A protein has these predicted regions:
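Residues within well-ordered alpha-helices
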Residues: 19-20, 57, 105
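Long, hydrophobic N-terminal alpha-helical segment
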Residues: 1-46
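A short, hydrophobic/aromatic-rich structural module that often spans a beta strand
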Residues: 76-98, 114-124
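Vicinal oxygen chelate
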Residues: 6-14, 58-67, 69, 84-101, 103-157
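Conserved short beta-strand elements that form part of the metal-binding/catalytic scaffold
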Residues: 30-83, 125-149
Length: 157
């Protein structure tokens, strides 16, 4: 197995408005697209294999070939975003790779001892994602995403 297409860097923040304003004002990054997730009633979210309530506020922006995802946890005690913020503070949380087969990729990684930390449905219908428990192994979390059909790499249109 080889992960070949990195499409996103995820950054956890305490104040999404402040962070996006600073990135825009100082570095000219933007415009940002904001969303609260889950954004559909049928969206599912699991942390360490158990369904958990969660609410996030996110901002997305394309910067060259990579998308930046800024994440502010709003609700829910049991999730990797709040855990990261509580233990490490703000910062780079994950790198996301597209995968052609979520089930096959996760199965191959489990054979190597890498477990799914959290997973769920994506913003776009039909999208699945899995955040892998790789912090101790490589110093950051790896996220996988699968969407049916061709993917342009962007989380939202």
């Amino acid at each position: 197995m080889k992960l070949e297409r990195a499409v996103q860097i995820g950054i956890v923040v305490r104040d999404l408005d402040r962070t996006t304003e600073l990135l825009s004002k100082i570095f000219g990054i933007g415009p940002f697209h904001f969303i609260e997730w889950p954004n559909r009633p049928e969206s599912k979210y699991f942390f360490r294999g158990r369904p958990e309530p969660i609410k996030l506020r996110q901002a997305f922006v394309q910067v060259g070939a990579l998308e930046l995802e800024l994440i502010q946890p709003l609700e829910g005690e049991n999730n990797a975003f709040k855990e990261f913020l509580d233990e490490r503070g703000e910062g780079i949380h994950h790198i996301l790779f597209e995968t052609p087969s979520m089930d096959d990729t996760v199965s191959q990684l489990k054979e190597q001892g890498i477990e799914v930390l959290q997973n769920g449905d994506g913003i776009r219908p039909g999208t699945r994602w899995a955040l892998l428990d790789t912090q101790a192994l490589v110093g950051f979390l790896l996220e996988l995403r699968h969407r049916p059909g061709d993917s342009d790499g962007a989380s939202i249109s």
